[in-house]
């Protein structure tokens, strides 16, 4: 069905715990209950994978009426139909690193060693001489990479028999939803998704070396040459929920195969760096603020000559994340690369915002979607180390978002992994087969799959863990302190340098677990 005169598609999102069926049935019936339009409203998308969301065709007046209903949390234009927000999968690439591999030099993901030791084994040095001796490989776990796609024939994703572990699936058929998946959905012409997958589950660069890998290309994350091959957020999230819900019990474990979803992307709003800035910071107004004054109040940008990017929260996306986790899905998400504090409504910085030339206010300390307090939000540590009176401490990467909403940190700078020929950054021949490519990238996009891969190892050991239990176990086992050089006496950043926050693989070198199974590569990878 299409929209009628003066109608457009809106997603009605309900509060948790209300009678969803009664509310939505009232909309499609000719009734007038508590401000619900007195006509039969047409469904635009039934959202069969969501209990709390349905898309309807409404007028602007009807939307405003429904927003007053006590059952309604929010009403939004679906993200795929908005032009004021975009998805970002920015990665950063530099030419020199201290604790990082070099292309074409038989190097590897240094995160494998760093996150397998509680204490920093590098001690201020670039090399350790240590090996990554792994005991678990993610067998029995499914990892979903929501990104730009995955190059499924890359050797990094082979199993011990040389077959690709990237599953060739049609998400519409897998979930039973009525949308059409593009014939070229299962490819990557950007390279970001392939790199992320290699870190989470590659056989040389990754953690979960025998996990099954699923690619779900998100609309808006495709390469410019690949536009239109992704799946819109609403169908993508519903597909994962319905697929996980319908999984059978694995006879080898007595549980469903665990599902880990990595999300190395986020929503942002852009605005020009010039113009008349009005800053609100901690309840104080700074009209006609300069760029330097804006930065001093915690608003960071890539460059004053470029558009500024502000993390943006989308209610429907965050509700989808909550519903995924309630289904039992593990969600791991990148914090973002804006060096911004992320905080909740209880914090003094929650309402920090900027207004440009009298436009609407952009709040910059609330983080970005996808997010929910029950997911695992990951910041990045740097290749450089902080010298604390002779003790070398891992430090937050200069670009990484931080603050109370960031749950844990992982190596994110100078991470080598598999990529496609199409990657826009510098790349070189894959060191194990020169018909393919590898590259070194930096970003919280690279840190998030480190945690997703380690999560798969925990789930291989204990496949019945709930998302809440897994998160608590990962945080309880977190490693040594992370120094945040962005922290200032004024409290612009609130990350406590004494809090253990670095992800730790307890099934690695420090605490080996007796495990017998098929491994996709040999152990003893040198660093």
Task: Tell me what each language-model feature is.
Residues 11, 142-146, 198, 212-217, ...:
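Structural recognition of the beta-strand scaffold that forms the well-ordered cores
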Residues 31-114, 337, 383-384, 395:
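Autoinhibitory propeptides
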Residues 3-15:
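Short glycine-/aliphatic-rich beta-strand segments at the starts of folded cytosolic domains
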Residues 267-407, 414-451:
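Substrate-binding/specificity loop regions of serine endopeptidase catalytic domains
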Residues 17-19, 80-81, 148-152, 157, ...:
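Acidic glycine-/aspartate-rich tracts in secreted/extracellular proteins
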Residues 197-200, 214-221, 259, 412-493:
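Hydrolase catalytic cores
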Residues 94-199, 205-212, 220-224, 228-231, ...:
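Active-site core segment of subtilase-fold serine proteases
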Residues 211, 215, 237-241, 248-265, ...:
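C-terminal subdomain of the subtilisin-like protease fold in secreted/lumenal serine endopeptidases
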């Amino acid at each position: 069905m299409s929209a009628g005169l003066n109608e457009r598609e809106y997603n009605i999102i309900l509060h948790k715990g209300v009678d969803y069926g009664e509310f939505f049935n009232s909309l499609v019936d000719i009734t007038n209950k508590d401000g619900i339009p007195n006509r039969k409203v047409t469904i635009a998308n039934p959202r069969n994978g969501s209990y709390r969301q349905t898309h309807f065709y409404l007028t602007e007046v009807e939307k405003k009426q429904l927003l007053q209903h006590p059952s309604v949390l929010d009403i939004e234009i679906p993200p795929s139909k908005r032009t004021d927000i975009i998805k970002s999968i920015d990665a950063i690439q530099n030419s020199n690193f201290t604790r990082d591999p070099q292309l074409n030099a038989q190097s590897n993901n240094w995160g494998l060693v760093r996150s397998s030791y509680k204490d920093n084994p590098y001690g201020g040095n670039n090399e350790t001489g240590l090996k990554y001796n792994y005991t678990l490989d993610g067998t029995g776990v499914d990892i979903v990479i929501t990104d730009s796609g995955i190059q499924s024939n890359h050797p990094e994703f082979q199993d011990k028999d040389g077959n690709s572990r990237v599953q060739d699936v049609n998400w519409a058929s897998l979930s039973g939803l009525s949308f059409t998946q593009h014939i070229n959905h299962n490819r990557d012409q950007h390279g970001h998704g392939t790199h992320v997958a290699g870190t989470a589950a590659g056989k040389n660069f990754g953690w979960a070396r025998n996990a099954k890998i699923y690619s779900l290309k998100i609309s808006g994350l495709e390469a410019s040459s690949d536009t239109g091959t992704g799946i819109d957020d609403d169908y993508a999230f519903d597909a994962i929920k319905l697929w996980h819900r319908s999984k059978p019990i694995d006879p080898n474990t007595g549980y469903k195969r665990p599902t880990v979803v990595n999300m190395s992307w986020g929503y942002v709003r852009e605005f020009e760096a010039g113009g008349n800035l009005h800053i609100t910071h901690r309840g104080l107004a700074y009209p006609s603020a300069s760029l330097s004054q804006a930065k001093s109040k915690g608003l960071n940008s890539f460059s004053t000559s470029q558009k500024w990017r502000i993390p943006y929260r989308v209610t429907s996306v965050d509700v989808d994340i909550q519903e995924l986790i309630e289904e039992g899905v593990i969600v791991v998400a990148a914090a973002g690369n804006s060096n911004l504090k992320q905080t909740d409504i209880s914090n003094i910085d929650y309402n920090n915002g900027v207004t440009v030339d009298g436009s609407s206010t952009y709040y910059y300390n609330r983080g970005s979607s996808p997010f929910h307090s029950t997911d695992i939000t990951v910041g990045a540590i740097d290749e450089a180390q902080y010298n604390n009176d002779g003790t070398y401490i891992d430090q937050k990467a200069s670009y990484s978002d931080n603050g109370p909403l960031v749950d844990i940190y992982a190596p994110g700078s100078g991470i080598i992994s598999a990529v496609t020929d199409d990657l826009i950054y510098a790349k070189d021949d894959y060191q194990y087969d020169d018909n393919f490519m590898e590259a070194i990238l930096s970003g919280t996009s690279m840190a998030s799959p480190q945690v997703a891969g380690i999560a798969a190892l925990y789930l291989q050991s204990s496949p019945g863990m709930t998302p809440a239990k897994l998160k608590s176990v990962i945080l309880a086992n977190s490693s040594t302190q992370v120094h945040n050089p962005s922290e200032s006496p004024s409290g612009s950043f609130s990350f406590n340098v004494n809090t253990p926050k670095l992800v730790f693989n307890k099934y690695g070198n420090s605490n080996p677990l007796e495990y017998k199974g098929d491994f996709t590569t040999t152990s003893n990878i040198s660093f």
